[in-house]
Design a protein with these regions (language model features):
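Residue-level signal for inorganic ion chemistry
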Residues: 13, 67, 106, 167, ...
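A non-catalytic, amphipathic alpha-helix used as a structural packing/dimerization or gating element
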Residues: 18, 22, 62, 166-173, ...
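Glycine-rich, Lys/Arg-enriched anion-binding loops that position phosphate/diphosphate groups
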Residues: 129-231
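N-terminal catalytic cores of NTP/NDP-binding nucleotidyl/phosphoryl-transfer enzymes
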Residues: 1-59
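Hydrophobic/aromatic residues located in beta-strands of well-ordered beta-sheets
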Residues: 34, 106, 136-137
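N-terminal Rossmann-like or analogous alpha/beta NTP/dinucleotide-binding catalytic cores
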Residues: 45-132
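Generic structural signal for residues in well-ordered beta-strands
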Residues: 75, 136-137, 262
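Phosphate/ribose-recognition catalytic cores of enzymes acting on nucleotide-derived substrates
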Residues: 184-296
């Protein structure tokens, strides 16, 4: 028995994991193999469907790590191209799932649609799967507290409003940004609050709404509390555009050029414009005091 699940799985959120966990459990119960088949890049990028507005919850590497952490036996990435997008449901099932991977069972979430024929009706979808010689295995949807089915789109909307607590709850883990520390103007150092400026590894990664957040920072193999500012630094008026800068509590090491990860714990406030650097410093001290109440 080879049990598969397919999809983009952006964020590998709680709804995705219900599907993945079902595939893993079914395979183990029958001494079979579980396989997750995903795609890269995002279809909207390839098909130019509002591609300029697309933001992702996870990079390909983040997705791989989170899927494999569920106990999946094999993680497969298929290149998403225009030719690939033209495959019908039956062509995809026959050519790839059966032809390449010998899939016998396919776990399907509530909103899973297949192929260029965009089969969304559950009965019709399952009928096509059976006709191709695969057993469909349905999984009910994961419901949020608001009564809506959990989806990547929902979580993107929530994070875009700055609610990292709810976003993290639906993901099942703290939302995070990964990148390399790059040189800034070092103005923070002059007021006693040096910051690490982050250049993201995944340029399409969604950045939460502008504001100041309590974060967990991982650098040099250790974790620390931090306060992260996302925005345009209106007090400085330097016109640098959106930046992600983080002050790491009780930390004073040179980390330019190093990997850095920030996990969002809670939002403290909106970004503000202050009359002077001294006023900014006073507010940062308040932010620091508030951040210390949180645990990593």
């Amino acid at each position: 028995m080879i049990v598969a699940a397919t999809g983009f799985f952006d964020g590998v959120h709680s709804g995705h994991r219900m599907v993945i966990d079902k595939a893993v459990a079914l395979a183990k119960e029958n001494n079979g193999k579980s396989i997750i088949v995903t795609f890269w890049p995002h279809p909207r990028n390839v098909l130019q469907l509002d591609a300029d507005k697309l933001r992702l919850l996870s990079s390909l590497e983040e997705k791989r790590q989170r899927v494999l952490a569920c106990g999946v036996d094999e993680f497969v990435v298929l290149p998403f191209t225009r030719d690939f997008s033209g495959l019908t449901a039956s062509e995809f099932l026959s050519r790839y799932l059966i032809g390449r991977y010998g899939v016998t069972h396919l776990v399907l979430g509530y909103d899973h649609h297949l192929g260029s024929d965009d089969v969304r009706d559950v009965d019709q979808r399952d009928r096509i799967v059976r006709m191709c010689g695969i057993v469909p295995v349905p999984v009910s949807d994961s419901i949020s507290a608001s009564g809506r089915a959990v989806s990547s789109t929902m979580i993107r909307e929530i994070l875009s409003k700055g609610d990292v607590v709810l976003g993290g709850s639906l993901l099942g883990y703290r939302y995070a940004l990964d990148g390399v520390v790059v040189s800034g103007q070092r103005i923070g150092r002059t007021i006693g609050f040096p910051t690490a400026n982050l250049s993201l590894y995944e340029p399409l990664k969604l950045i939460p709404a502008g504001g100041v957040y309590v974060v967990c920072v991982t650098v040099l193999g250790k974790t620390h509390l931090g306060i992260c500012n996302i925005g345009t630094r209106p007090t400085l008026g330097d016109g640098r555009g959106q930046i992600v800068e983080t002050h790491i509590l009780d930390f004073d090491e040179e980390i330019y050029g190093l990997d850095l990860r920030i996990e969002f714990i809670s939002r403290l406030r909106d970004e503000q414009k202050f009359d002077s650097l001294e006023d900014l410093k006073k507010q940062l001290k308040k932010d620091l005091s508030a951040a210390r109440k949180f645990e990593i």
